């Protein structure tokens, strides 16, 4: 796993790639792979590249009701998953911080995963701003300015 403070997906991805090249160069070490499915992992959702990229994102307006329901509704059409910062089935942060990652990691490249996450987060932040200008909550639509909230917080991780 590689992590970085701030919204530095490319830097984190580059560090992970370099580390994996070193590991793969060690004599006798191989990763389990399938010609059909790519890298084989202990978690079926990580089949393919074996990589999960995520960003902790503060979206207080889409989580104003204390749940991730509106955030998930806004993220799903963007191809993103929302979960608590402690992993699957954990609650969102009290300040509206959630973990965002691409839903699909099978049959796409590592670069496509990072690009999908980056572009999806930009659109999700627009929905967060729209929710801020409409008084919080709800899925929000398009752009819009107004009331604050919505920032890449803490770190991004690629594993």
Q: Where would I find each of the regions flagged by the language model?
A:
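Short, hydrophobic/aliphatic alpha-helical segments
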Residues: 15-41
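A generic alpha-helix structural signal
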Residues: 13-20, 71-72, 121
């Amino acid at each position: 796993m590689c992590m970085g403070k701030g919204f530095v997906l490319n830097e984190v991805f580059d560090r992970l790639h370099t580390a994996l090249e070193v590991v793969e160069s060690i004599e006798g070490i191989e990763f389990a792979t399938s010609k059909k499915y790519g890298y084989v992992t202990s978690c079926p959702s990580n089949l393919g590249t074996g990589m999960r990229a995520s960003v902790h994102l503060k979206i207080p307006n889409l989580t104003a009701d204390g749940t991730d329901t509106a955030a998930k509704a806004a993220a799903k059409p963007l191809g993103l998953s929302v979960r608590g910062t402690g992993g699957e089935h954990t609650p969102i942060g009290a300040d509206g911080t959630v973990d965002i990652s691409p839903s699909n990691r099978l049959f796409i490249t590592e670069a496509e995963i990072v690009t999908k996450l980056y572009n999806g987060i930009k659109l999700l932040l627009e929905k967060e701003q729209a929710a801020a200008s409409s008084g919080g909550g709800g899925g929000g639509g398009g752009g819009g300015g107004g009331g604050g909230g919505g920032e890449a917080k803490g770190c991004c991780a690629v594993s």
